[in-house]
Amino acid sequence: MQINENKGFPTEIPIIVEDELFLYPFMITPLFLSDEENLKALELAIQGETPILVVPTKPQQDGARDFDGIYDAGVIGTIMRRVPLPDGRVKVLFQGIDKGKILKQSGINPLRGIVDMLHVKRPSQVKTDALIVVLREKVRELSQFNHFFPPDLLKTIEESAEAVRVCDLVSSALRLKKQIAYSFFVEENLEQRLLKLIDYVIEEIEANKLQKEIKNKVHSKIDKTNKEYFLKEQLKQIQAELGADTSREEELEEYRKKLDAKKKFMAEDAYKEIKKQIDKLSRMHPDSADANTLQSYLDWVLEIPFENVAKKKSSIAEVSKHLNADHYSLEKPKERIEEYFALRELLELRGVGEKVNNGAILCFAGPPGVGKTSLANSIAKALKRELVRIALGGLEDVNELRGHRRTYIGAMPGRIVQGLIEAKQMNPVVVLDEIDKVGRSYRGDPTAVLLEILDPEQNNKFRDYYLNFNIDLSKIIFIATANDVSMIPAALRDRMEFIELSSYTPQEKFEIAKKYLLPQELKKHGLKPSDVSISKEALELIISDYTRESGVRNLRRRIADILRKVAKNILTKKNEGKISVTAKNLKEFLEKKVYEIEPADKKDQIGLVNGLAWTSVGGDVLRIEAIRIQGKGSMQITGQLGDVMKESAQIAFSVVKVLIDNKKLKVPMPIVPKFDDDKHKLEASDVYRRYDLHLHVPEGAVPKDGPSAGITMATAIASILTDTKVKHDIAMTGEITLTGRVLPIGGLKEKLIAAHKAGIKTALIPRKNYDRDLVDIPAEVKADMKIIAVDTIDDVLKNALVAKK
């Protein structure tokens, strides 16, 4: 299509917006169109066989497709070819013909405007020729410094007779910023445009001359073959031109002094690596990115306390003293810890201290708040070592432990090395907290690093990626903590020796509150024993009705709640003299009761059985209900139960069916439904064929799972199918097999404590638990409750069902 500047303009034409290119009339340019507005403008131009205007977006307006985000001038041209691409874009070949200016906005989606051509005001031919000569001369001079003007382009500029075209050629080659390119583009006065271009080219020449001069100055001072050194010296020279201070000898000298002071305490490879990095830093300019990274590295590594190792040896007496002073009860864990450190002390006394760490790593396992971290703190105090806690919960990135390579932005040492720096010791006590909650992701498996850290054969040469040298971790005492041992990978479990910390009994919580928590909280709140007292009954009420946990964290919080109110009352003078908190006035200091264990029913019922459950905050009484409805022998199970518990219910149903078939359970025939079309005499087995059972575990919002309710569900089913009451003051726990055997379960201590709180008088437990775990049950529980060992479901039903008269 030919555009005649004397015909058809101004006229309305569609507008394509270009984000990256600044086009000129003489160009044939491929454009890649993907957005809806540009594609619509393209279709409009093709269908109407009209020219099209391509305009650039303004700076920081890439992606804009409205008149506010674009310049009001561009190139008028035609579409030579259109090719759809597989990715949905359209490639067009655009031929620029002339410059155009938007006079008026006439539409959007697509953009359309009334466009007229830009009319050039030309000076006299003599002046134009003179300016063109100067411009060509300056362009030739500039081409000596950069590659903006290849020979073919220079030849075209020299041979072109059209001044406007020469200006466009030079402008397109200079790679101008959009604002500058636009100001040159819309300049209608040819003389002014030539002068602006000449000035710009002269500025570029001067800038390139200065750059070359700096290079020459540097080049004369250094070895031409040392490219890296050349670049750094060049940067120095530039900074010198800007007046920057490059002196840093004092800082480098400080690094060298620190390194020399630590030299005799560190390995040879560590010393060489740090010295190498100091020397490298001395050759860098202080403002370079690499210098900042290297300086950060030296700040880290020279803080590692190579020279500081705690001299205190293991002392069983000190360990025992601190454990007993800081912790009530926990006799078995304390005994095992004392044995562990007795071995260390014996090895040290006999001069084989280097073998001390060749034993298993201690891991304190138990519910939250039972004193796992506190035990580690007591050990650290006894050994006069610093305690470093490293939280592993949710850790997925292996670099968090091993350190980040220095090539990454924000790189730093791993948490182990950071812990040594924090402790200012090379042999602190390091607590690896919540080791059972370590994750894994595409960034690696932290478990593999932990295996190396905890292996006495490997951890004397642990390599942190950030440090880039080996560091000795063998002097560290590692102690792990976990809530659920089963979640720890097998290889890691093999490295550790587990010390179980179970839930505290109410009596233990009372003693802990009286001897530890209350004195500590009084001190923390600025109170004295003469200011406030909490009665025994009030403390017992707080433990039973205001907290439900395995440990004592919430108990500490409730005591703190009381003391804050006491402090307020003292300051507002609401109370004169000593404030006494009793069971009667406890509600004035704490809100309503939060927890309350439902007491056992006071009468025997059919289909209602007390089971026992273990939770993360202790034990609980789990009441299981069963009803029968005339039907076809199916069973429905509700209460948000897991798969294991559902399977236990099915097994229990099958076991009871067998007992009925074998006449070990007597079914009163009057309860068996009769049908009009019965053709055979009713049998006991008809009771489970003609009834549907519904088994329910209350508190349906709480998920429940596990096999330990097996005998409880079997008892409920047997009770409802034989119309026999279950003793109201009995509770039970145990897994049932298809042959009626009772298998052992876990969490017995917590379960029996919960039963004791609920007023249960008799507990049925598996024989193996009776023989193995009864020694761990608190004395007050065993004194108040009859505990019966059962081997089979027959034993369970014999003790649980009320004998019929």
Swiss-Prot record:
Q: Which residues form a coiled coil?
A: none
Annotated EC: 3.4.21.53
Q: What induces it?
A: By heat shock.
Q: Where in the cell is it found?
A: Cytoplasm
Positions bound to ATP: 366-373
Alphabetical keyword list:
ATP-binding, Cytoplasm, Hydrolase, Nucleotide-binding, Protease, Serine protease, Stress response
Q: Which reaction does it catalyse?
A: Hydrolysis of proteins in presence of ATP
**GO CC terms for this protein?**
cytoplasm
Q: What class of enzyme is it?
A: hydrolase
Any Gene Ontology biological process: cellular response to heat
Q: What is its main location?
A: cytoplasm
Xref: Gene3D superfamilies: 1.10.8.60, 1.20.5.5270, 1.20.58.1480, 3.30.230.10, LON domain-like (2.30.130.40), P-loop containing nucleotide triphosphate hydrolases (3.40.50.300)
A GO molecular function assigned to this protein is: sequence-specific DNA binding
Q: Which residues form the Lon proteolytic domain?
A: 603-803
Annotated Lon N-terminal domain residues? 13-205
Which positions are catalytic residues?
A: 708, 751
Q: How does it assemble?
A: Homohexamer. Organized in a ring with a central cavity.
Looking up NCBIfam families in the UniProt record yields: lon
According to its UniProt entry, what is the function of this protein? Answer: ATP-dependent serine protease that mediates the selective degradation of mutant and abnormal proteins as well as certain short-lived regulatory proteins. Required for cellular homeostasis and for survival from DNA damage and developmental changes induced by stress. Degrades polypeptides processively to yield small peptide fragments that are 5 to 10 amino acids long. Binds to DNA in a double-stranded, site-specific manner.
Q: Which family does it belong to?
A: Belongs to the peptidase S16 family.
- Its name, as the record gives it, is Lon protease
